[in-house]
């Protein structure tokens, strides 16, 4: 009987049956042929074969201001898609023009942000402000509930204890500690204020990390006082002010996660938004966390929940940098913006350069561990692309015309006006981002 069932499941497909294995084989064969043809075409270009291809642990320039190399390979046209979608191996090469060097310098400057969280005095100060007993109690209770649910379903618990600690921190940070600022109230009469341009920072404000100051005027004509709103980037100062917008929220919350022992990434989005990623030892992957929205593990929030077009999402940590765009943009054709800052080969080169700079003095064993972690994350990011492609192929079949859940479905909040939500967040700031663009951070 078992043998009969086996033969029944492997019988040749009829004209009315759909064989996914056959479609998969045909698709793979087609991509092999296309990849081989493209590689042959590339091999005929002598300039391409001369381009350097540094590995993460080879000798490379460690400072953005170093001179151009003697050989300048021809640059392909920038792509609006992630390199994984082109199904071609990337041969990294260094920046060759002014725009590429500008982007490289920007990423190097941004990569310094998470290194500031390693100050022992800063972490001690942060711990003194966190209600540890409350957070650990909430985490313990939530962890027990998760474990009980897992036992009843005979499954592995979804989250571990450390994950629950960060989730408790997220709730406390959003609801009790940090405060959102649109227009700061008048400090003299507490009346709402009206934006009145910008002002240069005072020496004291500049010393505390304020690169720019927003100026507001009291809406009460009888008062007319001016209110200054320095945009502090120094985390020490944020522990005192406890207010700000997206940039301040992500910066301070990321540092708090580090203070609680978490491995932290500060994620920069080229559309001028920032958030946090925390590594889950339980799930062995990086988790998206947005302190402003109090969201946990909802990476598709921005593209699919808010309907935003996204080009670059670069995650920075004390271990280097990673292009995590594929985690947040599952369908580049629908939600991706043009990736035109630099060619993909140059972006890979810059990321490898930052990784080498952060890791070259680490023990060899730790370097190997991080390298394996990079490989595991790359497989995860490729899986997102493969699942999105599989869902699109499945929807092309006549029997699957009706809407169905995608295999990589992750729930996102149902926002009444997702477009307005993002636009409002961008209007909350009004200051230029690190690359000089006007944005919400």
Swiss-Prot record:
Annotated stretches, region: Disordered: 1-23, 38-91, 397-441
Bias-annotated ranges (Basic residues): 1-11
Modified residues (Methylhistidine): 6-8
Family under the similarity heading: Belongs to the transglutaminase-like superfamily. PNGase family.
Binding site for Zn(2+): 186, 189, 218, 223
Residue stretches of biased makeup (Low complexity): 46-84
Highest classification ranks of the organism: Eukaryota, Fungi, Dikarya, Ascomycota, Pezizomycotina
Keyword terms of this UniProt record: Metal-binding, Methylation, Zinc
Protein name according to UniProt: Protein PNG1
Molecular function GO labels: metal ion binding; peptide-N4-(N-acetyl-beta-glucosaminyl)asparagine amidase activity
């Amino acid at each position: 009987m078992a043998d009969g069932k086996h033969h029944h499941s492997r019988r040749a497909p009829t004209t009315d049956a759909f064989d996914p294995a056959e479609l998969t084989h045909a698709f793979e064969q087609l991509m092999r042929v296309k990849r081989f043809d493209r590689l042959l075409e590339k091999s005929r270009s002598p300039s391409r074969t001369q381009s350097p291809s540094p590995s993460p642990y080879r000798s490379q320039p460690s400072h953005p201001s170093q001179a151009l190399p003697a050989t300048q390979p021809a640059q392909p046209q920038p792509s609006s898609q992630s390199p994984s979608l082109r199904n071609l191996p990337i041969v990294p090469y260094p920046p060759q023009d002014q725009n590429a060097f500008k982007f490289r310098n920007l990423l190097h400057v941004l990569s310094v942000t998470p290194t500031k969280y390693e100050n022992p005095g800063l972490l001690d100060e942060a711990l003194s402000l966190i209600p540890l007993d409350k957070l650990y109690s909430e985490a313990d209770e939530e962890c027990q509930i998760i474990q009980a649910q897992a036992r009843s379903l005979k499954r592995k618990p979804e989250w571990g204890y450390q994950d629950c600690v960060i989730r408790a921190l997220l709730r406390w940070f959003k609801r009790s500690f940090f405060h959102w600022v649109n227009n700061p109230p008048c400090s003299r009469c507490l009346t709402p204020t009206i934006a009145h341009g910008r002002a240069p920072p005072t020496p004291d404000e500049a010393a505390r990390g304020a690169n720019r100051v927003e100026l507001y005027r009291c809406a009460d004509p009888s008062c007319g006082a001016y209110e200054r709103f320095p945009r502090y980037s120094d985390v020490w100062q944020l522990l005192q002010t406890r207010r700000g917008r997206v940039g301040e929220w992500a910066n301070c919350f990321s540092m708090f996660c580090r203070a609680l022992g978490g491995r932290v990434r500060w994620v920069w989005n080229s559309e001028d938004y920032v958030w946090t990623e925390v590594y889950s030892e339980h799930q062995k992957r990086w988790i998206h966390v947005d302190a402003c929205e109090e969201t946990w593990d909802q990476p598709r929030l921005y593209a699919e929940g808010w309907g935003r077009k996204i080009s670059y999402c670069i995650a920075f940590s004390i271990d280097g940098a990673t292009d995590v765009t594929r985690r947040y943009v599952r369908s580049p054709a629908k939600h991706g913006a043009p990736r035109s800052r630099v060619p993909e080969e140059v972006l890979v080169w810059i990321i490898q350069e930052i990784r080498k700079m952060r890791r070259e003095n680490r023990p060899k064993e730790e370097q190997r561990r991080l390298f394996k972690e990079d490989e595991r994350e790359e497989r995860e990011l490729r899986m997102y692309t493969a699942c999105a492609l599989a869902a699109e192929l499945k929807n092309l079949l006549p029997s699957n015309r009706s809407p169905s859940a995608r295999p990589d479905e992750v729930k996102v909040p149902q926002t009444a006006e997702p477009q307005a939500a993002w636009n409002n967040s961008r209007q909350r700031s009004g200051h230029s981002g690190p690359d000089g663009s006007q944005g919400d951070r």
